Amino acid sequence: MHINQKIRFAVIDRQADSLHSLIADGQYRNTSLGRDAWKALIGSQGSLQRYCNKEGFNALSLLSSVVKIRIGIVGHDYGGCSYCDSRIGFGAGGYPDDSNVCGNVADGRYDPDNGGKNIKGIGYILVQ
């Protein structure tokens, strides 16, 4: 992810026929990078709510109209993932800024761990 003149990478070790086969059907497929690895893509400004932490391919809040992300992590301010108000990743959309499709969004009203953020980035996805 390219943010503020820095490029940072994370490795997701996943077997599949193609990246398309992992995301096209819309089914959730978990990953296990952990919230700190996702936040590291943003740098020291990365911010997520402390709960839910649903990460992977096609991660979304239980109410899919709220937050969805093709590759990344979503967070919530208390247990459960019904109304997620923060996210980091690629191919994102939803509350509170539907125009931020790559980067970090965290609504400051709902206790994200590093304050409210709306950081837009450029995504690089390399497939081997």
Predicted segments, located by residue:
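Mature extracellular or lumenal effector domains of secreted proteins
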Residues: 1-128
